[in-house]
């Protein structure tokens, strides 16, 4: 007996097969609607079974099958149907009315679950030992013209089974099931290999297709049976009734309604001896890197596991049809590796590409090619492809490549050349590829491993040290290690120099050479986009980084070793060899390395190449310039002269770089010299010319520092260079990788000042400056300079003529500096430890700080009842020095000099402003006072300051707070809020808590006891005050304009002593402040010029003697003699109105020498009386 695919037994004369009880699952993936008008499937089923019942169930063997556990299950078509009934056909046949019996010819074995609504393209037909009473299958029958069919629920029940068994269908022995017209229905032919069929369906289910490639799964589509290989209408064969019909297979996932893809139609049948459950593990081929930085071109494992021909064929197929996701790509190539032969013609890509020929010989239309990506140079399962991008071999328009068989017409034979290129590891240039618009280099893994010694194995980001180390000694053919467009597009043959132009949009052929040579072309001749792209992205790092501008210790050491090889000191020893360094050169190398390390601690070595011409002669390893240029200069300049025949030609590049350095041309070849850091000064002073550096914000901060010579490097680098007699290029030597916004403010500010000076500067005069004073000129000048190299004998002979001009310029600069220092010192803002302060102190004597002011006077013993004398016993100027106390502060603070007279009469308690309890010397107190004097002028006069006593220690936590200790006197300036005062202590102003101090009741004005007046010699006249005069001391008489004064005596030529009638006020006042209206004849004759010491000392010395002992060296007899003569050594300009002006060689009669270093005397030249610094005069 035999069984058909439906599981029903029938008699066959051909063979006898033993039945085995195996559960069988089959499905029909392509069930499509065949027509609009058909009868009800229920009636069709009944009519068919009435005609030929043994076709459905088998005639004589039904009982035997039932006994073995197989039941005949017929669908019970319920009356609940859609209004539109569609006739069901199998396999998309679009013929006339076809009987649906062939669809229902197999009994159902229901599954344990219901089908999802989304997977309703077919009904799974299954045998089972136990059947449920009823189960619904929802089938959407679709018509050919795209209209939606009806959902037909299928029910099975025992009642319907009994009704169906009596129906018979027409039977044609030997032909198989037929429709009403007698045409055999479609019978599956692959039942002998069920696993292969289910595997194909499983792959179609789990494949993610391109959006829009297929229509909605519910839309009607027509696929003729001739285009499928799974089903075809034919008569019964041996495979229909084979024993494989009952082979047990696992229950599959219900397949979706997916039309067969064009690639699947051409799949060949797998061999019977293949493993039945063989699955392709794609993880080893598709192990994607975790990040893009781990990706290494050429290291994909697919290159080691698959054949290049298969790679190429599948890549061509993929290049013409790009799937939209990595999942579909993975599925496509997984099937192709299993089903397609290794070598074969390309399959047609559906109806769209069926007319195309194999692109192996297809003509590529040159630069007007419509292919986006032409040739795939790697496996489809490479990591980059798994991420959705194609690493493809780019032909025009951006870059051209020709292999061994490349032709200018651009035929696709270069694909074959590329395959041959993969097999030539030694003599091949890296293929230039593009990924998403950026270049990447991909090459076979075998080539990378075989050429690792001579070719750089990777193209990736490299450090500066690695880029600098890849030199001609290490690599005979160095490669550009850069990601930039310019460097990858511009790879050239490094063994012979040729003019480089930008990549031509046409494929070029280089005869006699297996490598394509990409040539540069001027940006102005290239298309507009390429020109713009060049200006944006052209940073050829081979030109930039393979220079001898070395910036690290490692690079310096390698450079030093290379120079030793050039000199022949190492006798063939190379830095790349494993041999030890010769023993005799070790000490020299160590000392040299120490120097290099010391140099590397400072800024990068500017190098001699900064002032040397550009090396236009190509070196041995190709185009390797000797210096680094700015990006702007590389972008703006045209193609430089790079051919050896053009190298000797004099040229001068006027680039558009805003910052340039012009170097003169007459230069003698210099022998290589090593300058240590100590030689810098000598080298710097060898040059006699300066040139201003024009710049803009493009200049980096390091360039500015280079200009201002702040580096500790010698001006000449330690690299060996070849100099040529021609004009130099103007270039910005820049070690900055980009713009430095941080340096913009400082640099542009200096540039404004520089350009303003530059417009008014005399160039010939500047060129004649003496080099001997160049260091001082650099110190003095605030403008950065760049030296010109002038080593010609003509310039050296002119050095002797420029000393006078340099001296004049320096004298003017020093004068400005002195004026500035003096102004700063007068304001008190010049620190004592500043270099300018020390410089001036060497030129002029230090003016002593005055303790003979009013505040010092109030610290004298006459104020001891209220203000005790400091413990250091500081002595003060005698009271008769009326000029000493006129101003309260020393000469170091001229901004507070003329403002304290207006409150001189109210100094009773206000003069206790200074903290007398402080043990510090009064000089420091005056210094602190000077810092707060400006605040006093701003509206807080000392009479408004309220004294307060600190009841607790307070330590300032911030700079705004004021520290003091318990018992200190603090002067309150104002009240900040309810908790804080602003006050003054020791000359410092700050805030402190209110609760930390206790206000003091202001005492009565503390006026010293006035000495009894001497015997009056008689009135000498009367005078009227012309101006207001405020007394600074208690011996002076304050005047108001218009006051009438009785003149008692003439103290000296500058002072009168008098009194105001009607009051007890008496004192001295300046002669110039009053106008004499009445003069007694006797008094005028008796005292035409009264002796100053006698009359002056009678009042003042009495005051001194009544308070403290008289100083040694100052006696009454000395005063009687008119003073001790001194001669002025320097000019002194008064800074306060009580000071005496001195001119050099003036003779001054000194009346008193104060302990603070100031003298009191009268100038014989001007007849003025005042104070002056004691170190400005010498004894005669």
From Swiss-Prot:
Ranges of biased composition (kind: Low complexity): 367-384
Record-level Gene Ontology MF annotations: protein domain specific binding
InterPro entries referenced in this protein's UniProt entry, alphabetically: Endophilin_SH3RF (IPR050384), SH3-like_dom_sf (IPR036028), SH3_domain (IPR001452), SoHo_dom (IPR003127), Znf_C2H2_type (IPR013087)
Coarse class of the protein's main subcellular location: cytoplasm
Modified residues (Phosphoserine): 27-28, 40, 130, 143, 239, 319, 325, 328, 339, 367, 377-379, 381-382, 384, 463, 574, 577, 630, 633, 829, 923, 1097
Posttranslational mods: Ubiquitinated by CBL.
Keywords assigned by UniProt, alphabetized: Cell junction, Cell membrane, Cell projection, Cytoplasm, Cytoskeleton, Membrane, Phosphoprotein, Repeat, SH3 domain, Ubl conjugation
Region listing for Disordered, in residue ranges: 25-60, 73-96, 216-285, 314-392, 911-945
Annotated ranges, domain SoHo: 166-230
Residues in SH3 domain copies: 943-1002, 1018-1079, 1121-1180
Biased composition regions of type Basic and acidic residues, renumbered to the chain: 237-247, 261-285, 933-945
Transmembrane stretches, start-end: none
One of the protein's GO biological processes: regulation of skeletal muscle acetylcholine-gated channel clustering
General function of this protein: Adapter protein that plays a role in the assembling of signaling complexes, being a link between ABL kinases and actin cytoskeleton. Can form complex with ABL1 and CBL, thus promoting ubiquitination and degradation of ABL1. May play a role in the regulation of pancreatic cell adhesion, possibly by acting on WASF1 phosphorylation, enhancing phosphorylation by ABL1, as well as dephosphorylation by PTPN12.
Domain notes: The first 2 SH3 domains are required for WASF1-binding. All 3 SH3 domains can bind independently to PTPN12.
Binding partners and assembly: Interacts with ABL, CBL, DNM1, DNM2, FLOT1, AFDN, PTK2B/PYK2, SAPAP, SPTAN1, SYNJ1, SYNJ2, VCL/vinculin, WASF, ABL1/c-Abl, ABL2/v-Abl/Arg, ACTN, CBL and PALLD. Interacts with PTPN12 and WASF1 via its SH3 domains; this interaction may mediate the partial PTPN12 and WASF1 translocation to focal adhesion sites.
Name of the protein: Sorbin and SH3 domain-containing protein 2
Native source organism of the sequence: Mus musculus
Gene assigned in the entry: Sorbs2
């Amino acid at each position: 007996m035999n069984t058909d695919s439906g599981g029903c037994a029938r008699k066959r004369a051909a063979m006898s097969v033993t039945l085995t009880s195996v559960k069988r699952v089959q499905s029909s993936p392509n069930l499509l609607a065949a027509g609009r008008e058909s009868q009800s499937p229920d009636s069709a089923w009944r009519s068919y079974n009435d005609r030929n019942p043994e076709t459905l169930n088998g005639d004589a063997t039904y009982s035997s099958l039932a006994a073995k556990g197989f039941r005949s299950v017929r669908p019970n078509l319920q009356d609940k149907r859609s209004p539109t009934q569609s006739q069901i056909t199998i396999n998309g046949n679009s013929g006339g009315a076809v009987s649906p019996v062939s669809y229902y010819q197999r009994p159902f074995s229901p599954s344990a679950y219901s089908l999802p609504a989304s997977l309703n393209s077919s009904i799974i037909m299954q045998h089972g030992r136990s059947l449920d009473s009823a189960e619904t299958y929802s089938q959407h029958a679709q018509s050919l013209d795209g209209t939606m069919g009806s959902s037909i629920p299928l029910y099975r029940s025992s009642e319907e089974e009994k009704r169906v068994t009596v129906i018979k269908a027409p039977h044609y022995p030997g032909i198989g099931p037929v429709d009403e017209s007698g045409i055999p229905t479609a019978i599956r032919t692959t039942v002998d290999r069920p696993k292969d069929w289910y595997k194909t369906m499983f792959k179609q289910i789990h494949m993610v297709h391109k959006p829009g490639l297929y229509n909605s799964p519910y839309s009607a589509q027509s696929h003729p049976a001739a285009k499928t290989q799974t089903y075809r209408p034919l008569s019964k064969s041996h495979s229909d009734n084979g024993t494989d019909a009952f082979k047990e297979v696992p229950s599959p996932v219900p397949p979706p309604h997916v039309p067969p893809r064009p690639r699947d139609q051409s799949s060949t049948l797998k061999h019977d001896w293949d493993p039945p459950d063989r699955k392709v593990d794609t993880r080893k081929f598709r192990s994607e890197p975790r990040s893009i930085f781990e990706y290494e071109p050429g290291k994909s494992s697919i290159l080691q596991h698959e054949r290049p021909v298969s790679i190429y064929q599948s890549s061509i197929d993929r290049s013409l049809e790009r799937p939209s996701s990595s999942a579909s790509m993975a599925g496509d190539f997984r099937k192709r590796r299993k089903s397609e032969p290794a070598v074969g013609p390309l399959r047609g890509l559906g109806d769209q590409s069926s007319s195309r020929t194999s692109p192996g010989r297809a003509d590529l239309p040159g630069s007007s090619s419509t292919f986006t990506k032409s040739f795939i140079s790697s496996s489809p399962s490479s990591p980059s492809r798994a991420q959705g991008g194609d690493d493809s071999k780019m032909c025009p328009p951006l870059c051209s490549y020709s292999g061994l068989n490349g032709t200018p017409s651009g035929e696709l034979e270069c694909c074959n050349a590329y395959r041959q290129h993969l097999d030539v590891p030694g003599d091949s240039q890296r293929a230039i590829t593009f990924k998403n618009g950026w270049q990447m280099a991909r090459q076979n893994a075998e080539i990378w491993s075989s050429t690792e010694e001579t070719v750089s194995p990777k193209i990736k980001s490299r450090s500066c040290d690695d880029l600098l180390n890849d030199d001609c000694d290490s690599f005979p053919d160095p490669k550009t290690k850069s990601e930039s467009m310019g460097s990858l597009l511009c790879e050239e043959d490094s063994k012979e120099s040729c003019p480089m132009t930008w990549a031509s949009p046409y494929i070029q052929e280089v005869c006699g050479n297996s490598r394509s040579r990409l040539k540069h072309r001027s940006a102005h001749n290239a298309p507009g986009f390429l020109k713009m792209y060049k200006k944006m992205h052209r940073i050829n790092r081979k030109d930039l980084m393979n220079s001898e501008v070395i910036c690290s210790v490692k690079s310096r050491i390698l450079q030093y070793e290379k120079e030793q090889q050039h000199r022949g000191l190492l006798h063939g020893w190379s830095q790349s060899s494993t041999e030890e360094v010769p023993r005799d050169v070790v000490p020299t190398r160590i000392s040299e390395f120490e120097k290099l390390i010391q140099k590397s601690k400072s800024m990068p070595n500017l190098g001699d190449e900064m002032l040397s011409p550009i090396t236009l002669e190509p070196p041995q390893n190709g185009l390797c310039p000797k210096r680094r240029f700015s990006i702007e200069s590389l972008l703006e300049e045209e193609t430089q002269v790079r051919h050896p025949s053009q190298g000797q030609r004099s040229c001068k590049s006027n680039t558009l770089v805003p910052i340039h350095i012009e170097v003169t041309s007459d230069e003698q070849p210099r022998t290589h010299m090593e300058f240590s850091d100590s030689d810098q000064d000598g080298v710097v002073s060898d040059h006699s010319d300066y040139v201003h550096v024009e710049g803009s914000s493009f200049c980096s901060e390091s360039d500015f520092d280079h200009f201002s010579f702040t580096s500790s490097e010698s001006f000449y680098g330690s690299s060996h260079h070849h100099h040529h007699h021609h004009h130099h290029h103007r270039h910005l030597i820049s070690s900055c990788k980009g713009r430095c916004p941080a340096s913009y403010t400082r640099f542009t500010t200096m540039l404004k000042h520089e350009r303003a000076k530059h417009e008014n500067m005399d160039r010939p005069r500047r060129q004649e400056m003496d080099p001997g004073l160049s260091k001082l000129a650099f110190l003095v000048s605030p403008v950065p300079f760049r030296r010109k190299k002038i080593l010609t004998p003509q310039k050296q002979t002119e050095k002797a003529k420029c000393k006078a001009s340099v001296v004049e310029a320096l004298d003017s600069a020093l004068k400005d500096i002195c004026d500035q220092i003096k102004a700063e010192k007068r304001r008190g803002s010049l620190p004592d430890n500043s270099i300018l302060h020390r410089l001036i102190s060497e030129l002029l004597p230090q003016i002593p700080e005055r303790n003979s002011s009013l505040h010092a006077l109030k610290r004298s013993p006459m104020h001891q009842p209220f203000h005790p004398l400091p413990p250091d016993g500081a002595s003060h100027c005698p009271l008769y020095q009326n000029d000493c106390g006129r101003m309260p502060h020393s000469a170091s603070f001229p901004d507070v000099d003329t403002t304290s007279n207006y409150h001189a009469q109210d100094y009773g308690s206000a003069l206790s402003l200074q903290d007398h309890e402080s043990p510090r010397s009064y000089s420091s107190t005056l210094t602190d006072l000077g810092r707060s004097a400006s605040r006093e002028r701003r509206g807080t006069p000392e009479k408004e300051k309220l004294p307060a006593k600190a009841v607790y220690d307070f330590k300032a936590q911030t700079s705004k707070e004021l520290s003091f200790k318990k018992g200190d006197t603090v002067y309150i300036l104002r009240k900040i809020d309810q908790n804080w005062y602003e006050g003054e202590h020791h000359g410092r102003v700050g805030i402190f808590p209110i609760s930390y101090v206790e206000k003091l009741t202001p005492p009565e004005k503390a006026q010293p006891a006035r000495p009894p007046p001497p015997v009056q010699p008689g009135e000498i006249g009367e005078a009227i005050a012309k101006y207001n005069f405020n007394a600074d001391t208690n011996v002076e008489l304050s005047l108001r304009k218009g006051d009438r004064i009785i003149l008692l005596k003439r103290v000296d030529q500058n002072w009168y002593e008098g009194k105001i009638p009607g009051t007890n006020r008496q004192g001295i006042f300046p002669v110039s402040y009053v106008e004499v209206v009445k003069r007694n004849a006797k008094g005028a004759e008796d005292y035409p010029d009264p002796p100053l010491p006698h009359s002056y000392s009678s009042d003042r010395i009495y005051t001194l003697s009544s308070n403290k002992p008289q100083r040694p060296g100052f006696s009454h007899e000395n005063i009687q003699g008119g003073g001790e003569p001194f001669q002025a050594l320097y000019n002194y300009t008064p800074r306060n109105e009580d000071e005496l002006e001195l001119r050099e060689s003036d003779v001054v009669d000194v009346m008193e020498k104060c302990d603070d270093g100031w003298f009191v005397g009268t100038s014989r030249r001007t007849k003025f009386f005042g104070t002056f610094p004691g170190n400005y005069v010498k004894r005669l």
